[in-house]
Amino acid sequence: MSVSKKPMVLVILDGYGYREEQQDNAIFSAKTPVMDALWANRPHTLIDASGLEVGLPDRQMGNSEVGHVNLGAGRIVYQDLTRLDVEIKDRAFFANPVLTGAVDKAKNAGKAVHIMGLLSAGGVHSHEDHIMAMVELAAERGAEKIYLHAFLDGRDTPPRSAESSLKKFEEKFAALGKGRVASIIGRYYAMDRDNRWDRVEKAYDLLTLAQGEFQADTAVAGLQAAYARDENDEFVKATVIRAEGQPDAAMEDGDALIFMNFRADRAREITRAFVNADFDGFARKKVVNVDFVMLTEYAADIKTAVAYPPASLVNTFGEWMAKNDKTQLRISETEKYAHVTFFFNGGVEESFKGEDRILINSPKVATYDLQPEMSSAELTEKLVAAIKSGKYDTIICNYPNGDMVGHTGVMEAAVKAVEALDHCVEEVAKAVESVGGQLLITADHGNAEQMRDPATGQAHTAHTNLPVPLIYVGDKNVKAVAGGKLSDIAPTMLSLMGMEIPQEMTGKPLFIVE
């Protein structure tokens, strides 16, 4: 009979940051007797989850993708945002063979160069500075027909903040004397990640057919009309931008289409609609054979050009477990499943030997403030069963509530989400202690602790750059180390498990066994 394993469990409370100020702080306002008691009585520390400590630009807020890559890698992983900033600054970007090749090919054939992406200074899925550099690259290489298709943010940025970005690009095109913003649409449609194909179809039709629900002469006018309809940036309906006498910007065979998002999860669906011959998410009214370039690799099975292919990470936590014949479980809801699998494994899609995965469906609601507990009860039930099963050496779990409900900007809902999490943590901690296992509770970045923007008075729907908690629950006598960061978590887990830390992991253990 095999011996029951005592698992090392990592619970990631997505969007659960630490903030001393109590105003507009859903985590402080919520009744959290369990987390309060753990913080008071167990070894704990605060760790950095943003900026240079996670490979992002200085003071840049953290995000789930970046957070999980650092958590799993055990070393600071320089993110695409930072890498692209450097490439643009030293002008290597302007010589990227994939980007220049696509532009030159379209230009030489008299075709258009279409640039699409999230027009945002948020830096989570994209950055407008990168899009600006792409416009400049196309113009410098002599492209005449340059069309920008702007997906509007309002989620990683304030809800109504797109106007200054659109103005900047309209001014740029005016200065160049060519090109224009050809369409605007909210990210709710263009960047779905939950197979809501009816949304993606609206964006696809706007791009391929130059057909939308609305039309305006300029991008700013189109945005102002959306605000008048009470649509915030994220939800702006498909709007064609085309003044009298301007050519139609519908996509044609042979055009170049460059997708400037660098984060994969919300880029995949619309990319598949363009690239996959066997695409069946919706019946495409127009199938165009464009020269499609992904800025980064959105998925290994999407067969199209990639401007910046992934650098592979060796000996991530998951791979190291497999090499040491350990069993592991990854478990989360739909919204964060990719994060505890693909991203935690350093961008590797397939599971490692001995790695099981459990996916709990996120509730099908329009926005998560309508169901702030999400699917946490079912997730907890499955997680507790796995802890007690004796099957796993380690378990990685993500609860999405703090982040997904924090993004709605609805304070009361975020408070309910945090209270639901407190009940879940109680169940998990009890289960871990009952089998003699160990538990680390942390977060990948902040969100719910800051629900209103003090500067603008608007709802604060974005992540924060605040530290996150790290708590140890277990029978070892440990002392916490200050000054940690997300990439210290994997080495911390390995040291608590009594395992060797691979040399590729440069993070340091944050709990020292006394």
Curated annotation (Swiss-Prot):
Record keywords, A-Z: Glycolysis, Isomerase, Manganese, Metal-binding
Q: Where does Mn(2+) 1 bind?
A: 403, 407, 463
Q: What the protein does?
A: Catalyzes the interconversion of 2-phosphoglycerate and 3-phosphoglycerate.
Q: Do you know which CDD domains this protein is assigned to?
A: iPGM
Give one Pfam hit by family name: Metalloenzyme
According to the record's subunit comment, the protein's assembly and interactions are: Monomer.
Name the positions where substrate binds: 125, 155-156, 187, 193, 263-266, 336
The protein's name in its UniProt record:
2,3-bisphosphoglycerate-independent phosphoglycerate mutase
Q: Which InterPro entries match?
A: Alkaline_phosphatase_core_sf, BPG-indep_PGM_N, Metalloenzyme, PGAM_B_sf, Pgm_bpd_ind
**Enzyme superclass (EC):** isomerase
Q: Which residues bind Mn(2+) 2?
A: 14, 64, 444-445
Gene name for this UniProt entry: gpmI
EC number of this enzyme: 5.4.2.12
GO terms in the biological process aspect are: glucose catabolic process; glycolytic process
Organism domain of life:
Bacteria
Please name the catalytic residues of this protein: 64
Q: Which family does it belong to?
A: Belongs to the BPG-independent phosphoglycerate mutase family.
In alphabetical order, the GO MF annotations are: manganese ion binding; phosphoglycerate mutase activity
HAMAP family, per the entry: GpmI
Query: Which pathway does the UniProt entry assign to this protein?
Result: Carbohydrate degradation; glycolysis; pyruvate from D-glyceraldehyde 3-phosphate: step 3/5
Q: Would you tell me the Gene Ontology cellular component terms?
A: cytosol
